[in-house]
Design a protein with these regions (language model features):
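Acidic, surface-exposed loops and disordered segments
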Residues: 1-217
Length: 217
């Protein structure tokens, strides 16, 4: 893929609001997108996420009153994803220890040099000293995951749209009631739908480069 094709792909990627309900993403293509999400980068490589693929039609109907910004995705898109974010991802948490031992295959305890680097990064550099700040920082990682999946989808000719229009507390309570979320461990970060648009692509409206880009010599 050359530079011109890369830019053309950005223009082709479109936050579609209308989807063809009769067109479905193939199993192989969807497996590829999930793999892209799995391989996405995250701060310190902690992967503080989980994806829920919502296929249950009854649950889609139930979510509509509490997810106004997701109606088009719940009604017509081929695949609808709820991105969960892990809570309490501190340097000394059981989860971080588990990641280091089982995924990174490295020795790790809260007194090790690497643990202290993470501690300093979280507490002093990023000021992650509250439950909310930790949640927001971890949520940023899920947006990277979602963005990577959306761009990979565009490469496969699949449309997508990120979704933030929902009542977080109500959605979390509903998912917990259904047994798909433990709010002591996870929260809802963002949603996205994937499928094939049933509308024309409108030209992108963006600031000119000189407004949003500056070089420091």
């Amino acid at each position: 893929m050359d530079r011109e094709q890369v830019i053309a792909l950005q223009h082709q990627r479109f936050a579609a609001k209308k989807y063809d309900p009769n067109r479905r993403i193939s199993e192989k293509d969807w497996e590829a997108l999930v793999e892209v999400g799995r391989l996405a980068p995250s701060s310190i490589g902690l992967e503080p996420w989980k994806m829920l693929l919502l296929k249950n039609e009854r649950m889609k109907e139930d979510l509509k009153p509490m997810a106004w910004g997701a109606l088009f995705g719940l009604e017509g898109a081929s695949h609808f994803v709820i991105y969960l974010v892990r809570k309490g991802v501190t340097y000394d948490s059981d989860y971080v220890k588990k990641v280091m031992h089982e995924v990174k295959k490295r020795d790790y305890d809260t007194h090790s040099r690497f643990a202290q680097i993470i501690k300093n990064f979280q507490e002093n550099d990023m000021k992650l000293n509250s439950e909310r700040s930790l949640f927001d920082w971890a949520s940023k990682q899920t947006y990277i995951q979602m963005a990577n999946m959306m761009m990979a989808a565009a490469m496969l000719g699949i449309d997508s749209c990120p979704i933030e229009g929902y009542d977080q507390e109500k959605v979390e309570a509903y998912l917990e009631e259904k047994g798909y979320l433990n709010t002591a461990e996870f929260g809802v970060s963002v949603m996205a739908c994937f499928g094939y648009r049933n509308q024309e692509i409108t030209p992108k409206t963006r600031w000119k480069t000189e407004v949003i880009y500056e070089v420091i010599e």
